[in-house]
Amino acid sequence: MTTRSPARPLIARRSTPAPTPAPHDPAPSRLSYRVTRLWLTPIFRKALHLGIPVFALFAAVTWYLGDETRVAELFEAVQEIRREVENRPEFRVNVLGIDGASDDVTEQVRAALALDLPISSFDLDLDELRGRLEALPPVRTADLRIQSGGYLAVRIDERIPAAVWLTHEGLSIVDGDGIFVAGFGTRELAAPLPLLGGEGANLAVPEALALMEASSILDDRVHGLVRMGERRWDVVLTNGSRILLPEIGAAAALDRVLALDDMGEILSRDVTAVDVRNPGRLTVRLTDAAMEELQRLQTLAAERPDGDTRG
């Protein structure tokens, strides 16, 4: 049997040419170009290098603090470290020193501070303690400093008692500015103080002290000063007599009365008041007994013949 070869086509087929590959563009794509440009920006690179660690740290801290137990343990550890530092000997105050205050005021200062020594300097609020002390009536200003060796130095500028002020509410001690210092009898006084009376007397203490100084020539015959109508002063003597001073020029008017008394002892006579409120006129008011005696003498003088001057 003869093997037949496959039939060949009468018309030869032309082979299909392979597709031509697209030309390669060496330029980068827009996205690649923008990414490259962004990466080459110094600010972006720094932000990326710094931002990733910061974000990682923030995430870690957030995760750690998300557990209340761990937060409580961390807080307790910090508090323990703080306590150890605060309780170190070099930070403790062991001694309290008070300077510039009398014995009575010193006791008030100690009571106001109410410090339980020894105490850590971190537990002392000096501004708050200063406010306590300056709220005390006898304290003008206070200065507090923590010095080496655990010494708390307190410097007091004390109000000096200058006068005793009498009002309807009782007696009180005031300083040279008329500011309340203490109730009368609540503290010892180094010397007797001038007595002032009347409403508003505390507002004119400097003038009152000047008048008391001017009247010192009368020694202990001056009982005190009374403020009248919150405008002027009356000088009250121990025998009950008064010197009525004007609102303006009180010191000069008082000097006139003292000069008259030096010449004629007018204040030692039977007078109830010497009125010098009018600068151009001095008025003397006699006691009732003196007025009766004066009237008797005037009556006798009227009954006598003219020219008869015998008593």
UniProtKB/Swiss-Prot annotation:
Lineage: Bacteria, Pseudomonadati, Pseudomonadota, Alphaproteobacteria, Rhodobacterales
GO BP: any one term: FtsZ-dependent cytokinesis
Residue ranges of the TM segments: 47-67
Family, per entry: Belongs to the FtsQ/DivIB family. FtsQ subfamily.
Protein name: Cell division protein FtsQ
Keywords tagged on the record: Cell cycle, Cell division, Cell inner membrane, Cell membrane, Membrane, Transmembrane, Transmembrane helix
Subcellular localization, as worded in the UniProt entry: Cell inner membrane
Cytoplasmic domain ranges by topology: 1-46
Pfam families in UniProt: FtsQ_DivIB_C, POTRA_1
InterPro entries named among the record's database cross-references: Cell_div_FtsQ/DivIB_C, FtsQ, POTRA, POTRA_FtsQ_type
Membrane protein topology class: Single-pass type II membrane protein
Region spans: Disordered: 1-28
GO cellular component: cell division site; plasma membrane
UniProt domain POTRA: residue ranges: 91-159
Biological function: Essential cell division protein.
PROSITE patterns named in the record: POTRA (PS51779)
